[in-house]
């Protein structure tokens, strides 16, 4: 929402006088000098603390991690945006036809105390150029643009930073972006327009940026590309201020339309519009100074019949724009501080977590290096123990190793049940054939024990290969879990990690072979048909009772009460014995095979791996080799430490800020 004239008068930060006097133009008159002094005192009292806070964060380098409040100036090519920056900063910037701003120019203005000398610095890539006079700025920026974007009309997204320190500038950060163009000319890339739009969007989409959209007064504002781009990233106009330039070029009779735009009656922006008249090309050719341009602008608006009202509303001239921008920037800083504080807190936490992954710096002393390796191996072994005991810490939506193994063992139990059920039909036919063709002198109802044994043995034998498959699956799950522990503890030490993985693989093969032998031995023992008498009797009794209950449920009476059928009775008897034994075999095999696997693939695997890791400590000569880091690890650790330090310092400064 744009403040009315009355509202403006009620704001503490209002009535700041005109922009600072440009350097090198101090002899313009006592009135201007008084205005500058008045601005300085009010600025120091009410504005400086906010700017100082952001400047201090920027000086810390926080801008490497998070966006800080700033002002970006965008506009169509030759819309007058550089002139606006020039008028605000008092520094003459590059001018000309075509694309003048070919790299983002970050203009950092720092106010010095009265009497201190003007200082400037242009920085790009790793080059710093110290400036001692404002007249050197234009050439230094052009040199930087040629260095970064090449001689010609190409653009680059690399920053050029211009630091200006002077008693006659406010503390502001302004960003001049390349002018929007639609058609490539000369040796420009064919997609120059798309490149520029992408570059501009990268800046204006940041919530921390106030967008100054510069539009000539003599064009239809609804069709301007700059305003359209700003509305895409800031649809409510919360961060956008429209600035109309070149009011002296408006066609006679269209002045009222310009007034309507400035009064926010055409394309609505919450922050509204302002209008300024900066130096034109003719003014520059006539060597009109920046201070004289401000006086000429004041006269223009005072004497213009339509635009005079805008001056009275505080919506015209560069001094009013400077006052407005100061208020907007301070308001924006205060609005951004809570979010900035949260972002710094979150970034500090994530950086701390990332730094923990890289661990501490490797000691230089050999004895300390050995102790460091002992700590790393002990941490690894503790993590392995936690896995074996089912106490490892897992992230959300992940599960512990034992949970994964339990699922496999449950599937194994289901496989046994499925296998026994699948063989029932074939068993019935086999038992029937024996009963009808091969029964010897046994009386009806007596089970041929040899047939009983053969049937049981065959069924159990079919489970051997599924047991091997489960063994291989579980081994792979355990191997993956142990490898993850190695990556967690040793990922930055490629020799130690590689040695651990090699040791892990050797032990895995050894333990898998041992487990396979034990499982096959178990199935060989299962070929001996045996069960404790009392256990078997109970199982047989249970089967008979269940069958009797089922029969009674189906027919209303048990089969024993029906007319006996010797053949059916004999078949039932055999199946009762088979089912009784299979139940006990199921209980035994479903538990014993997982026990074998846990013993060899989890318990012994872990113990041998832990012992193998401790054996690495016996060779003290290999300590340095094992602790050799990846080439970028120490650099990354240093980078994270620096980031952590500046974020911690930023947190302290934000905590002390009185606002």
From Swiss-Prot:
GO molecular function: GTP binding; GTPase activity; microtubule binding
Dynamin-type G domain ranges (all copies): 65-338
Location (main, coarse): cytoplasm
Chain intervals for the UniProt region annotation (G5 motif): 277-280
InterPro entries: Dynamin, Dynamin_GTPase, Dynamin_GTPase_CS, Dynamin_N, Dynamin_stalk, G_DYNAMIN_dom, GED, GED_dom
Binding positions (GTP): 75-82, 176-180, 245-248
Biased composition (Polar residues): 559-568
Record function comment: Does not show activity against influenza virus or VSV; although it only differs from Mx2 by 8 positions.
Protein name (record): Interferon-induced GTP-binding protein Mx3
Source species: Rattus norvegicus
Gene: Mx3
